[in-house]
Amino acid sequence: MLREFSFYDVPPAHVPPVSEPLEIACYSLSRDRELLLDDSKLSYYYPPPLFSDLNTGFPNRFHPPKSDPDPISIVKDVLMTKGIQMNSSFLTWRGLITKIMCAPLDPRNHWETYLVMDPTSGIIMMEERTRSETSYANQDRMCYWGYKFEAISTLPEIWDACSRDQIEQRDNQDVVPDEQYCSIVKINIGKSKLILAGEVDCIWDKKPCSAKESDVHSDDGTIEEDASNAENPNLHYVELKTSKKYPLENYGMRKKLLKYWAQSFLLGIGRIIIGFRDDNGILIEMKELFTHQIPKMLRPYFKPNDWTPNRLLVVLEHALEWIKQTVKQHPPSTEFTLSYTGGSKLVLRQII
């Protein structure tokens, strides 16, 4: 079985209703990939010194991330352990939905994900089994620049609880990407209910008291927000990025900002902080953006046929509905691949 979905076959439409992403659980991963059912690896933002050298510590203090992606069963296990029932169409990683949403921006990109409907819950679970990243010159060092920027922009505790040494010695610490804090959110996009998990780089101030997990699932299995006792922490979270700086007239810069927006939008992250660097990896400028302001900031630069945030959301809504309806035509536990090999189409194949 093979089915295709073309971005350009999606008719113009109003933007689908999208709910605010609500955190329903979180977890941490140690540098040894031990699963911790808490927020112990949540980092706190603290501005790095300008003109920091992002090469410092490479490669001697760099502990590269493990090569294989995490299975989505980790997230399922966290929710089950915490007693949070899942009432959704999809359970997957934020990054994979970002790939689907932003595929029209990358007509030369290639990736593949795996899907299966859980026979018990009926949820479509989606994951990567191998990393599908395009290689390029100087890749290891440039990836390190991003990890290093995160390391020198964060503290293990809120700043007034840290020692002077912890603040001033950030440039000398090991860079360990496998140590992570992850947020699990529920979000509705059109008729599709999703539970998404994604890494959070840091928090702007202090994590507010979120809903007790015992308060967010009802007798009928749906997840509910207890608004009287909870504040959604996701608006306090920060996404950290590094980039060369180009004017917004540059299509590549607009495309990059659209991806930053999509990635943070899907997890409900409130701020994006970009460290602009030169060709040698020197941090030359910092820019703080509120996620919701990026579409408005880009609007004057869009041309008639450009992929705008609204247009990407319409395509995502249709793609999710297409995946749901196609998978439901087959028995539960049937496995599929969803692939993109460039151009204008997603391809869904049944694994025989």
From Swiss-Prot:
EC number in record: 3.6.1.-
Listed cofactors: a divalent metal cation
Principal location class: nucleus
Residue numbers bearing the Phosphoserine modification: S218
Coiled-coil region: none
Catalytic activity: a 5'-end NAD(+)-phospho-ribonucleoside in mRNA + H2O = a 5'-end phospho-ribonucleoside in mRNA + NAD(+) + H(+); a 5'-end (N(7)-methyl 5'-triphosphoguanosine)-ribonucleoside-ribonucleotide in mRNA + H2O = a (N(7)-methyl 5'-triphosphoguanosine)-nucleoside + a 5'-end phospho-ribonucleoside in mRNA + H(+); a 5'-end triphospho-ribonucleoside in mRNA + H2O = a 5'-end phospho-ribonucleoside in mRNA + diphosphate + H(+)
Localization of this protein: Nucleus
InterPro entries xrefs: RAI1 (IPR013961), RAI1-like_fam (IPR039039)
GO cellular component terms given for this protein: cytosol; Las1 complex; nucleus
UniProt: a divalent metal cation binding residues: E150, D201, E239, L240
Role: Decapping enzyme for NAD-capped RNAs: specifically hydrolyzes the nicotinamide adenine dinucleotide (NAD) cap from a subset of RNAs by removing the entire NAD moiety from the 5'-end of an NAD-capped RNA. The NAD-cap is present at the 5'-end of some RNAs and snoRNAs. In contrast to the canonical 5'-end N7 methylguanosine (m7G) cap, the NAD cap promotes mRNA decay. Also acts as a non-canonical decapping enzyme that removes the entire cap structure of m7G capped or incompletely capped RNAs and mediates their subsequent degradation.
Protein name as annotated: Decapping nuclease din1
Source organism of the structure: Schizosaccharomyces pombe (strain 972 / ATCC 24843)
Name of encoding gene: din1
